[in-house]
Amino acid sequence: MTIKNFTFFSPNSTEFPVGSNNDGKLYMMLTGMDYRTIRRKDWSSPLNTALNVQYTNTSIIAGGRYFELLNETVALKGNAVNYIHANIDLTRTANPVSLSAETSNNSNGVDINNGSGVLKVCFDIVTTSGTGVTSTKPTVQTSTLDSISVNDMTVSGSIDVPVQTLTVEAGNGLDLQLTKKNNDLVIVRFFGSVSNIQKGWNMSGTWVDRPFRPAVVQSLVGHFAGRDTSFHIDINPNGSITWWGESIDNTPIATRGNGSYFIK
């Protein structure tokens, strides 16, 4: 058993006993990177000249390895989508990093800090015509973290969350279309035509599946189509559904509307 490669302890106060592999792991752990993601900063904008892109002053971290592109030029293919890759080969001690323009994203996720091989990471996507560059799109810089706690957050794009759907035949002609977002919010659409139900009855059909059940009773309001009247139902923590609309005889009345509730 061995514990080594401390980043906080220098026995003689003159050396830093951490190798480049360990330093690479440190970068990746601090930023939530994996071997298919990058960090990139253009200190000055790349230049596009004919079928060439020149990275005038760009910093990149890939596989935890930091390097700089200073007036580095990549030849592009015409009438194509060019995926610009950084290739890190630690066996090439004089020039361990090279750039290549390829016709697809060939990022390979090779673990160069614990094993061997050449790491390929795409960091730019450049589209060309027959004579020059028509568009550029840097690769998204992604972090993977277990939990984030922030005091304030501004989002300019979209937030993607897991989505599940469920259709519940609640009984007595009432149907519910449930859409759950990120195990937090459930959006409910009412449809179907209700009959043979009394106020306060538990509905006779299917209960709500466990993943969609609220922690406390949730009351949702819908309306009867073509009428000026509404109804509400309770979705109970055990999944049962209680009708709190008017009592309805055997003549069906169409329902419409939407509601929502938080699971927790």
Curated annotation (Swiss-Prot):
Keywords in UniProt for this one?
Host-virus interaction, Viral attachment to host cell, Viral attachment to host entry receptor, Viral baseplate protein, Viral tail protein, Virion, Virus entry into host cell
Which CDD domains does the record cross-reference, listed alphabetically? RBP-H (cd07964)
Name the principal localization, coarsely classed.
Answer: virion
- Gene Ontology BP terms: cell adhesion; entry receptor-mediated virion attachment to host cell; symbiont entry into host cell
* Source species, domain of life: Viruses
Its annotated compartments are: Virion
The record's Gene3D superfamilies line, in alphabetical order, gives:
Phage fibre proteins (2.60.520.10), Phage tail base-plate Siphoviridae RBP, head domain (2.60.40.1830)
Q: Does the keyword Metal-binding apply?
A: no
Any one annotated GO CC term:
virus tail, baseplate
Where is the region Host receptor binding? Answer: 164-264
Q: Which family does it belong to?
A: Belongs to the skunalikevirus receptor binding protein family.
Self-association state and partner proteins as the record states: Homotrimer; found as an assembly of 6 homotrimers. Interacts with host phosphopolysaccharides; this allows the virus to bind the external cell wall layer. Interacts with the distal tail protein.
Question: What is its biological role?
Answer: Binds to the host phosphopolysaccharides at the onset of infection. Upon activation by calcium, the receptor binding proteins change their conformation, presenting their binding sites to the host, and a channel opens at the bottom of the baseplate for DNA ejection.
Q: What is known of its domains?
A: The C-terminus is involved in host receptor binding. Host-recognition domains point upwards, towards the capsid.
The protein's name is: Receptor binding protein
